[in-house]
């Protein structure tokens, strides 16, 4: 449709212009950047403009059946089409090097960096020299009467909860909360994600310590002399990703 083509042209030009400004200040933004997700609603026409691994989903209620419309596709480094572009531009994609855990990241063949977990972003000037892109992907949906809400969230949400989980969580809360309390729903969603991150950190630490203990036993001929004491434990970086979420409620219809 013509409106979508115009939106793609406008936002591609806008994001490219912003990236050029970042490039002019490359000392400040060489290895620093951001993802972006925007929603433009004109009458009942919605355009989702995505760059990076934030995500937009719509919760739809069809005669009591809860349906999820995922309105954006994450720009992860290991997405096949994204990986291909990166490799053509002198980069490569590999799992995070520390302990062999973590997401796939973008690296330069001639440098240890940039180690980006996304394949598109604004800023990250060094990453853009090896195929990271500032061109957004745009999706379109004609909003319907039974579209109840749209959620946009950073990767700190989606790395620990799937799209159906998040939409189901919000529907469940809507059925319990009165209208003026809806601000609490997004606050509780963010807290739920934070709780899950904390559990992941505990699990990650357990795996790393078990691996290190196993290696020590091999070195010492099958005997772990320190007994795995707390004092001898290495400092393991605890990670809770940025957790940002916004919920836009339409005329919620739960029937």
Question: Which residues does each PLM region occupy?
Answer:
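PP2C/PPM-type serine/threonine phosphatase catalytic core
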Residues: 1-255
């Amino acid at each position: 449709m013509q409106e979508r083509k115009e939106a793609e042209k406008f936002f591609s030009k806008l994001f490219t212009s912003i990236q050029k400004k970042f490039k002019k200040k490359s000392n400040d933004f060489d290895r620093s950047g951001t993802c972006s997700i925007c929603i433009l609603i004109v009458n009942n026409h919605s355009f989702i403009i995505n760059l990076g691994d934030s995500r937009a989903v719509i919760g739809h209620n069809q005669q009591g059946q809860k349906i999820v419309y995922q309105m954006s596709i994450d720009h992860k480094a290991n997405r096949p089409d994204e990986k291909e572009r990166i490799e053509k531009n002198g980069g490569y994609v590999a799992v995070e090097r520390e302990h062999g855990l973590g997401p796939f990241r973008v690296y330069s063949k001639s440098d240890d960096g940039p180690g980006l977990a996304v394949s598109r972003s604004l800023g990250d000037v060094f990453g853009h020299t090896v195929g990271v892109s500032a061109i957004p992907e745009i999706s379109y949906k004609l909003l319907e009467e039974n579209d109840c809400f749209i959620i946009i969230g950073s990767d700190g949400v989606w790395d620990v909860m799937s799209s159906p989980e998040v939409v189901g969580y919000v529907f469940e809360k809507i059925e319990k909360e009165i209208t003026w309390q809806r601000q609490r729903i997004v606050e509780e969603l963010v807290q739920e994600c934070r709780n899950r991150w904390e559990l992941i950190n505990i699990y990650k630490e357990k795996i790393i310590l078990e691996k290190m203990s196993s290696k020590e036993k091999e070195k010492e001929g099958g005997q772990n002399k320190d007994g795995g004491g707390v004092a001898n434990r290495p400092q393991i970086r605890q990670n809770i990703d940025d957790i940002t979420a916004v919920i836009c409620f339409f005329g919620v219809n739960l029937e």
